[in-house]
Amino acid sequence: MFLDDLIIVKHQGKQFIKDLTKASLPEIFRGIPQIADETINTQELIDFCPTAAIFLDKNKLAIDLGKCAFCGDCQMQFPNKIKFTNQYKMATNNRDGLIVYQGETKEIKVEASLIRKEIQSIFNRSLKLRQVSAGGDNGNELELGACGNVNFDMGRYGIEFTASPRHADGIVVTGPISENMVEALQIAFEAVPEPRLFILVGVDAISGGIFAESTALKRDFLSKVHIDLYVPGNPIHPLTFINGILELTRKKYRR
């Protein structure tokens, strides 16, 4: 039992977090990556990524965290080129903000200029969300459930998940959005009273992930809605989600 407790502490940190905005995670956690200037076979690294998250932009390597599965294989194969930090604050309302370039120490955050005015004025004290799994694998769904447990307790900030979209202020989508879930997702979205939030959680929801080229997906619904927040991860960490929501809806938590 004691050994099990030590393993939990090593991988997840302390089991009760007093301040979710100042918490730190163990070094083993894979958060925002850094790309060094080390000379390698660039094409070999690009081809190595299973989700095409690594690419060249103006002769500089870049990683798109909206596509990254955070598998860590690139770091293991090219340890002198790529290193994942334990920085978990990487939710943003700017899709391009999820791209990390070679040689930079990236800070990913919610951009105040892109936040709709009504969000801050209406949802700055209480926020109810309806989660829709659109072909998800239960990984992100489990982590979202953990956001409300005694360890993270996002309810202390007035943030909760609700059973009905009619009782919600926004929709949280997980999964790559399979064709069979499009109608259900649209019904849930339209049932939420305006103004409503629309949040994509996890690599599958943001880009399709490893299923991006699958004919079973139908993601054109995303072009019809305003996306308020992207939360990268595979699966996401509760601290990433909670801090992203706080930055989006509460001015005092923005960096």
Short names for language-model regions:
Residues 36-38, 66, 174-177:
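Structural motif
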Residues 45, 57-60, 191-194, 198, ...:
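Ferredoxin-type iron-sulfur electron-transfer modules in oxidoreductases and energy-metabolism complexes
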Residues 207, 245, 255:
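Long C-terminal interaction/binding lobes of large macromolecular proteins
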Residues 142-144, 152, 158-226, 231-242:
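Cofactor-cradling patches in redox/metallo enzymes
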Residues 241-249:
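Short amphipathic C-terminal alpha-helix that caps PH/PH-like domains
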